Amino acid sequence: MKLYCNSNEVRSRTLATLRQLRQPSPATFLDTRRVDARIIKTGFDTDTCRSNFIVEDLLRRGQVSAARKVYDEMPHKNTVSTNTMISGHVKTGDVSSARDLFDAMPDRTVVTWTILMGWYARNSHFDEAFKLFRQMCRSSSCTLPDHVTFTTLLPGCNDAVPQNAVGQVHAFAVKLGFDTNPFLTVSNVLLKSYCEVRRLDLACVLFEEIPEKDSVTFNTLITGYEKDGLYTESIHLFLKMRQSGHQPSDFTFSGVLKAVVGLHDFALGQQLHALSVTTGFSRDASVGNQILDFYSKHDRVLETRMLFDEMPELDFVSYNVVISSYSQADQYEASLHFFREMQCMGFDRRNFPFATMLSIAANLSSLQMGRQLHCQALLATADSILHVGNSLVDMYAKCEMFEEAELIFKSLPQRTTVSWTALISGYVQKGLHGAGLKLFTKMRGSNLRADQSTFATVLKASASFASLLLGKQLHAFIIRSGNLENVFSGSGLVDMYAKCGSIKDAVQVFEEMPDRNAVSWNALISAHADNGDGEAAIGAFAKMIESGLQPDSVSILGVLTACSHCGFVEQGTEYFQAMSPIYGITPKKKHYACMLDLLGRNGRFAEAEKLMDEMPFEPDEIMWSSVLNACRIHKNQSLAERAAEKLFSMEKLRDAAAYVSMSNIYAAAGEWEKVRDVKKAMRERGIKKVPAYSWVEVNHKIHVFSSNDQTHPNGDEIVRKINELTAEIEREGYKPDTSSVVQDVDEQMKIESLKYHSERLAVAFALISTPEGCPIVVMKNLRACRDCHAAIKLISKIVKREITVRDTSRFHHFSEGVCSCGDYW
């Protein structure tokens, strides 16, 4: 097939390669004479060809203006002249000048079209690139694309390219015969383009039609499967590639290792690691980094560090992975160490893991660290990179600097779904759930589609209100948006229903999920754990392993939480001790905190202290608070005072819970002077007790109550109901437990104050506002007191209703005078 209509153009292009003879040397004039002789012999215009050489030489030296001056002054130009000048402008990014020359050309060659088309494609101006391709194919000059045109136009494709555009190019390639074996590169770029525009179905058809495939063909589809989440298919194709005799490359290992990470298949990943070692690819920087990332994503911090230390060549990716690995393990000091080391290595600052480090600052609520990182990002101009801007939004929001967060959010060059989710998440994480849901409504108005992370965040906000109606509305919206089959959205729904007290709905959503991964199982395990069903949580964990999935750190945390809530000390200890040797998971701070809670609740303080001494890090606020709470339950005043001393010495301690717990311990012992000392210390540090609130949803409206609240429109009816219930439960044997009252007042005043705690007001209001037999769900922002717990147990028996109270510790399902927690919380 004839691809060039102007044979002189081919000859002219051939002569242009003679510029290689004109390297600066003492023989320059001799070389020039030889070129001129060749030009005269072939019948070309000597002046034009010599000028073309000069233009190209000037462009090669970066002197674009001088080259353009020579070009403009040429009396006779040919297509080589203009193509050379267009190429020069394109290489310097001056596409406007290049386009002017292109539009003014009376005759264009395939080279002309390809040069300009390539610039548009490389710079993501796909509409213009494909428009030029169509114009070229329809032009009257008989200029048809060659294989270089196809391999220039297609490689830059991404999901912004219309799917039909790739199909049209494919059809033209077939028409011109470029789908045959001599042009395998064209078939390979077409295959990659179909993968990039998410048409795996067409990619698979093309793959099967390619008569003789090479390693690039296999690598392209392996990567395409992995990017689309079809991890099993990616692994199967890799095995097929090996069986067909094609040798894997560094790209092969990178793609298939990513697929293994997606499958959470640790054993298979280890096999691939071994194969990369035997084939020698493990020493390749890109493969080594992917192996490093594989171990990091499986929470194997020790293995990640060992491989990092053994790598022959470290680049910025290696440092990014090891910093992220320590961050995921909550070992922030180690992350900071490697970040400082990375700064001394001479890497381009734009490649620094600012997003990861900002996430650490957000998790630590360290505004100072966050601002330092912000300054570094500005110096590196990395704040213009969208994901760093999103991380800045997240950091400022989680440090409760919402004005700064919104300012950065508004200044982002492009507000994506991730940007909106970062801001929404910041509000939700700080307990401003209403503000988060309002932002979600605004996001919907901006015509952006919510993704799995967005839904997980708004479902969390919905769960915080315990509003089953709101949760079901979000469930319906997820169905309409086509995200129900997404495992992360499904997992978020499981979590939401569980936190709204509807474990039955949570289990149903889980069972209806078409695909389940570790996140789905973790949601179910946590749902059972939070609702006090330890046996079901442990059963779900066992089924997860039976399904072939490898448990991760979150899975173990869910089981430990279940054991803690149910008092399964021996089982909890077994799971904790099995983490490293059996499951290959390094315990994080949360796992240690859960074990301390389990041991402390059971009064096993010697074991708890031994565990704290053996931890690889210092006990933090959560751990000492857990010990203090256990001491309050078991009246261990000496250890309580030690725990309180540790807590009160923490500069960052802003939570009043530790002070309140210590006050309760002293009040129960009748040491009122020490109660006053604790309250004085609170005032001096400017720490205020968080007021107790409870809320209940009745008739699609949330009603909020505080202790001794007299502001509700139905206040008189509520008080009458409480007095009526108090009289009835007293006949059932109820005796007020005044040990939780920290005011030094007479006994009768203590009893009266207990009657009007926020959770009892909410229960009383629900009883007078809902039909008989209707279940009641009450939420509380603090831990339920022991007296209210005892009272609501008896109330559930008297009124013959299921009453659910969710506090900060767990769910309490009251029915027939019994609580699901077994009085253990």
Curated annotation (Swiss-Prot):
Residues 623-699 are annotated as: Type E motif. GO terms for biological process: RNA modification. Residues 700-730 are annotated as: Type E(+) motif. InterPro entries: DYW_dom, E_motif, Pentatricopeptide_rpt, PPR_At4g14850-like_plant, TPR-like_helical_dom_sf. GO terms for molecular function: RNA binding; zinc ion binding. Transmembrane segments: none annotated. It comes from the Eukaryota. PPR repeats lie at residues 47-77, 78-108, 109-143, 146-180, 183-213, 214-248, 249-283, 284-314, 315-349, 350-384, 385-415, 416-450, 451-485, 486-516, 517-551, 552-587, 588-618. This is Putative pentatricopeptide repeat-containing protein At2g01510. It comes from Arabidopsis thaliana (Mouse-ear cress). The gene is PCMP-H36.
